[in-house]
Amino acid sequence: MLKQTLLYTGKAKSVYETDSADHLILVFRDDASAFNGEKIEQLDRKGKVNNRFNAFIMEKLAEAGIETHFEKLLTPNEVLVKKLNMIPVECVIRNYAAGSLCRRLGVEEGKQLTPPTFELFFKDDALGDPMVNESQAIALGWATADQLEKMKELTYQVNDVLKALFDAGNMILVDFKLEFGVFHDRIVLGDEFSPDGCRLWDKDTKKKLDKDRFRQGLGGVVEAYEEVAARLGINLDDI
């Protein structure tokens, strides 16, 4: 598969066309960003670690019957994916209160949410990715009611699979975001799943093992990602 024109440069990944109309190549970069791009740094090895981590998670989800855009790893920081028509809405599941939920509702960080909450956010950096509801997403043409229902169903399925996976590594899956797109009329999981887009805490100490280490200036960001990978049995020796 040949990498061709650069289509898009995001906060942490670059997207390239290929010689296949149905495929793209994603390049995971070492960029770390927070607060809608207000804080940006380069973290050595981050791109390679996230690429390998994402591949592992996507394969686990596929084994559970959840279709993803992941096809195969190409290089330590490149991956071949299906070309989706992305839906501009993020799906967020929260198993415990953290981040913006605490700020919005005055909830103490760490409060278990039973059942887990489901939220939608409009992907727009200029607007700060505002929270939206299903009727707004439908009325504004971002997604159909059927698509949103499928996205919600798949997000809860992902939560069930990954809560068990991280629990086996003595970690709490606090919350996470997912993005979906359409591929030949099917709703398919896109983007990535890595510690950049979820919150993970050690079950015993509540040590943060995700991008909050970067947001909050705690340091040891990539080292925390590597610790998560090690607990899941992800081999990073060759990158």
From Swiss-Prot:
A GO molecular function assigned to this protein is: phosphoribosylaminoimidazolesuccinocarboxamide synthase activity
Q: Keywords, A to Z?
A: ATP-binding, Ligase, Nucleotide-binding, Purine biosynthesis
**EC top class named in words:** ligase
Provide an example Pfam family for this protein: SAICAR_synt
Give the catalysed reaction(s), semicolon-separated. 5-amino-1-(5-phospho-D-ribosyl)imidazole-4-carboxylate + L-aspartate + ATP = (2S)-2-[5-amino-1-(5-phospho-beta-D-ribosyl)imidazole-4-carboxamido]succinate + ADP + phosphate + 2 H(+)
Mention any one GO cellular component term assigned to this protein in its UniProt record.
cytosol
Listed pathway(s): Purine metabolism; IMP biosynthesis via de novo pathway; 5-amino-1-(5-phospho-D-ribosyl)imidazole-4-carboxamide from 5-amino-1-(5-phospho-D-ribosyl)imidazole-4-carboxylate: step 1/2
InterPro entries linked: SAICAR_synt/ADE2_N, SAICAR_synt_PurC, SAICAR_synth, SAICAR_synthetase, SAICAR_synthetase_CS
SUPFAM superfamilies found in the cross-reference section: SAICAR synthase-like
Q: What is its EC number?
A: 6.3.2.6
This protein's source sits in the domain of life called: Bacteria
- Give the UniProt record's GO annotations in the biological process aspect: 'de novo' IMP biosynthetic process; cobalamin biosynthetic process
Family assignment from sequence similarity:
Belongs to the SAICAR synthetase family.
Q: What is this protein called?
A: Phosphoribosylaminoimidazole-succinocarboxamide synthase
